[in-house]
């Protein structure tokens, strides 16, 4: 049988839904590829459990691909003392609650107790993943800019300029980030 590629986007702390979805995917880890497109945390009720589950999956199946999303980017900035209010306004409080079990003030600078293996996971996330036919990325690509010249901010955050573009990127782009009622399937891209 042909090798398959499965892509999962924007879990946002929904651990139960992730487990249900993983139980339905007919994946053969020895042949197929599984790509997670970022945004594992924030908004949903169980970000800690989601990250824990993904780390265990990565330990069992090292070939699974994990991309960085804009929410992991916001967490990184939050932990480094930048853009704290932005993070809290974008669903970050759920992640903080999940790790801390107490509310956090945006101006608090005391150590945030993320387990080392979770920090390692966040640091290991890739910005994109490329195959012969596809480019997987969290948010999208800026039209008319070669992949190697793409700006990190665009890979994690771009929306309308990419989603509305008919530009041929040379390969079909598989992306998450932009909320869609159903998958967007176009010749140059698939939004999930």
PLM region spans:
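N-terminal active-site segment of His-dependent metallophosphoesterases
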Residues: 1-53
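Beta-strand-turn-beta hairpins that frame and shape the catalytic cleft
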Residues: 2-6, 129-135, 186-187
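Active-site neighborhood of phospho(di)ester-bond hydrolases with catalytic His/Asp-centered motifs
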Residues: 8-9, 35-38, 65-70, 172-178, ...
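Active-site environment of divalent metal-dependent phosphoester hydrolases
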Residues: 12-16, 42-45, 73-76, 143-144, ...
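Active-site neighborhood of divalent metal-dependent phosphoester bond hydrolases
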Residues: 43-126, 160-164
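Short, well-ordered beta-to-alpha junction loops that form the rim of enzyme active sites
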Residues: 132-134, 139-141, 177-178
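Cytochrome P450 core scaffold surrounding the K-helix E-X-X-R motif
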Residues: 144-150
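Conserved beta-sheet core of the metallophosphoesterase superfamily
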Residues: 152-192
